[in-house]
Design a protein with these regions (language model features):
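Signature aromatic-anchored transmembrane alpha helix within multi-pass, membrane-resident enzymes
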Residues: 1, 8-19, 237, 254-258, ...
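Transmembrane-helix signature of polytopic, membrane-embedded enzymes
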Residues: 15, 130-140, 168-190, 229, ...
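Short helix- or helix-capping micro-motifs
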Residues: 21, 184-189, 216, 239, ...
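Transmembrane-lumen/periplasm boundary regions of multi-pass, lipid-linked membrane glycan transferases
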Residues: 43-65, 89, 117, 241, ...
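Transmembrane-helix motifs of polytopic, lipid-linked glycan transferases
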Residues: 143-147, 151-175, 213-217, 342-345
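Membrane-interface transmembrane helices that cradle and orient dolichyl/undecaprenyl
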Residues: 173-174, 178-179, 214-232, 242, ...
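Hydrophobic/aromatic-rich transmembrane helices and adjacent perimembrane loops
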Residues: 197-198, 204-208, 242, 251, ...
């Protein structure tokens, strides 16, 4: 620790840490593919007529699902990844055919502000020969190419994540010292929930790119003490992309809107510039998610199917379940303690009214998310719905009266690193013939069928 005090944090220190995390996660991102190496799975014949109609029904995640059969399960080994729902990205993109001007993904849980950029990423990789794609039969017969597609889809999310970290670093520098910003961003990079979801093809961590861009723009307006038309337009686009990727991020947009309205009331900001933001945000949301309106029937069918999973909780226990089962495992026990301190400090000791408003908003969101996710309250990954808490809490903490902020962040970093360490090992074990229960199961299936 004494050595760290002598280091004058420069930007390149942050760049080095971000690059190190990127390299490590890039190596880890190609995981969960060795099941297809077994002869039975490699050589089995799959009847495409028996594998269902997900590529033709109106809602990919609808009710029109055919019964299970051997061909369908073998197809899943060839075309699905180890991560639940990653294949829905591929199904949705497979329904989009630009040459025929067909852009409806027929899957809407992952927003268009995420799916369309992911599709553009794949189109670029295909053009330069990094990935190969074909029709359904070709993909089934070339499962190694499917593995490549999943790998580079995860890399797309990883790129977004490290860029979001860079934005967070520069945002925090507007409110605090370079050392504070460096420590906070490093914690952000190694947090368990971010380690997990930065190499999974889902929109939650990807949306942090737009969340942190919104906060970065806000920090520019705060430091300049004015909101220009350009900043308003940029803020509207970034919020629209954040919500257009993950609709629950609308709660984050409300927090940002409250901050902007508060400052507009207490400054000489032109009110028209303030209202540009929601207008542009809504416009961007509609542009990136047009088919929830154009193909409303499919959207309703998907929502109906998803509603079968959920019920609204009404008991305080669900709040405790959310914190104990998702927030602490996801954010880390040390950051959770820091979050509690930052919220209480802002509510009871801060002289900044806006800090109190933001803190009360976060508490309200915790209760709201806890109750609407009551049916899955035992899951450990629900913190993905509130990832925007992380940068907000660090900003609140930077305003606290605590004189030992750097020391506190060092402790949080150390404890978070210890808590995240098993995750790094888990990715190694996932492809280990000695430790992976999934691979051992595949080996057993292979051996049993080879005896027949």
């Amino acid at each position: 620790m004494p050595l760290f005090r002598k280091i004058h944090i420069k930007n390149f220190h942050m760049y080095a840490v971000i690059l190190l995390v990127f390299i490590f996660q890039y190596i880890n991102s190609d995981y969960g593919n060795k099941v297809n190496d077994f002869p039975y799975l490699q050589n089995s014949t799959i009847e495409t007529s028996d594998i269902g109609n997900a590529m033709s029904r109106n809602a990919v995640n609808g009710y029109d699902v055919r019964s299970e059969n051997v061909s369908k399960w073998l197809m899943r080994f060839r075309l699905y990844s180890i991560e639940a729902d990653e294949m829905l990205n591929i199904m949705a993109l497979g329904r989009i055919k630009p040459s025929k001007l067909e852009f409806d993904p027929h899957y809407y849980a992952y927003g268009g502000a995420y799916l369309y950029p992911l599709g553009a990423w794949y189109a670029m990789l295909k053009k330069i020969g990094v990935i190969k794609v074909g029709d359904l039969k070709w993909m089934i017969d070339h499962s190694d190419e499917m593995e490549n597609i999943y790998h580079y889809g995860r890399v797309f999310v990883l790129f977004s994540f490290v860029l979001s970290a860079l934005l967070m670093f520069y945002t925090l520098k507007s409110f605090s010292s370079p050392k504070f910003s460096f420590l906070a961003t490093t914690i952000y990079l190694i947090m368990p929930i971010n380690i997990m979801f930065s190499i999974i093809m889902k929109p939650y961590v990807y949306s942090l790119l737009w969340v942190n861009l919104s906060l970065f723009i806000l920090s520019i307006a705060w430091s300049k003490k004015k909101l220009t038309t350009g900043l308003s337009l940029a803020m509207g686009v970034s919020l629209g992309m954040a919500v257009g990727s993950v609709i629950i991020n609308g709660l984050f947009a409300v927090i940002v809107w409250l901050i902007i309205v508060y400052f507009s009331i207490h400054s000489k900001i032109n009110i028209s510039k303030v209202f540009i933001i929601p207008i542009v945000a809504i416009l961007v949301f509609f542009i990136t998610n047009p088919y929830i309106f154009i193909n409303y029937d499919a959207y309703v069918e998907e929502l109906s199917r998803q509603s079968d999973w959920f019920f609204i909780g009404r008991q305080p226990k669900f709040v405790m379940d959310f914190v104990s089962n998702s927030v602490i495992p996801g954010f880390g026990i040390a950051f959770t303690a820091l979050m509690l301190y930052a919220l209480l400090s802002s509510i009871f000791t801060s002289s900044h009214v806006i800090n109190k408003i933001v803190s009360y908003s976060i508490v309200a969101i915790i209760v709201f998310i806890s109750l609407i996710s009551a049916s899955i309250s035992e899951w450990h990954i629900n913190a993905r719905y509130v990832l925007y808490f992380i940068p907000i809490i660090f900003i609140l903490f930077s305003f606290s009266l605590n004189r030992n902020k750097i020391r506190v962040l060092k402790v949080v970093l150390f404890v978070t690193l210890i808590q995240s360490a098993p995750l790094f090992i888990a990715y190694i074990d996932e492809d280990s013939y000695e430790h992976s229960t999934r691979i051992k199961s595949a080996e057993w299936i292979n051996n049993q069928n080879m005896l027949v």
